């Protein structure tokens, strides 16, 4: 663990309780003499705290140091992924986070699994996964998450995003990944959706094998940093 997340990190005093308390003081057995590095995952600063008190169900911390220390990928990457199984989204989130993806937009394509619902509770769960990943890899800013109800909404929001499909040019490392790369579901895009893409740059992955959506995400996130 590179640091501990707390939404109020930077305050002169902090209270640690609940899940964070259990993890730090019962699982990891942090002692009162130890100092803790905390982040709020918003401002890029690393805040160092010392212990003022460790009680049975909470700990009180006192701020003793502040250091500007941003840890992010060199290039910004925005992935626009059609909704796949929730469990598969959850599996790839830590990988995308470690590869420096700056934003993940989810949308329902024509061939998306409609029984997979992306609501505020799901987005909150995704954010928790990303927070734990940041604590492990050291990333200093949280990935942005959002959801759209259909393909046209996502296209309207990101008019310069490119598309990953089977019939495009080979995806170059020089592509503008910050403007967004649209990745379809397992069944690909419908003919109607392909009609929406006529004015957009179409790319393909230079492999003869058919990749799952989550594999395509990791591939794009990786090549974006080359």
Swiss-Prot record:
One Gene Ontology cellular component annotation held by this UniProt entry: cytoplasm
Keywords for this protein: Cytoplasm, Methyltransferase, rRNA processing, S-adenosyl-L-methionine, Transferase
Enzyme Commission number: 2.1.1.193
Keyword Lipid biosynthesis: no
Coiled coil: none
Top-level taxon of the source organism: Bacteria
Pfam families linked to this entry: Methyltrans_RNA, PUA_4
Reactions it catalyzes: uridine(1498) in 16S rRNA + S-adenosyl-L-methionine = N(3)-methyluridine(1498) in 16S rRNA + S-adenosyl-L-homocysteine + H(+)
GO process terms (BP): rRNA base methylation
Localization: Cytoplasm
Stored Gene3D superfamilies: 3.40.1280.10
One GO molecular-function entry: rRNA (uridine-N3-)-methyltransferase activity
CDD domains: RsmE-like
NCBIfam families named in the record: PRK11713.3-3, RsmE family RNA methyltransferase
Family: Belongs to the RNA methyltransferase RsmE family.
Function: Specifically methylates the N3 position of the uracil ring of uridine 1498 (m3U1498) in 16S rRNA. Acts on the fully assembled 30S ribosomal subunit.
Name listed for the protein in its UniProt record: Ribosomal RNA small subunit methyltransferase E
Organism whose genome encodes this protein: Helicobacter pylori (strain J99 / ATCC 700824) (Campylobacter pylori J99)
Gene name as annotated: rsmE
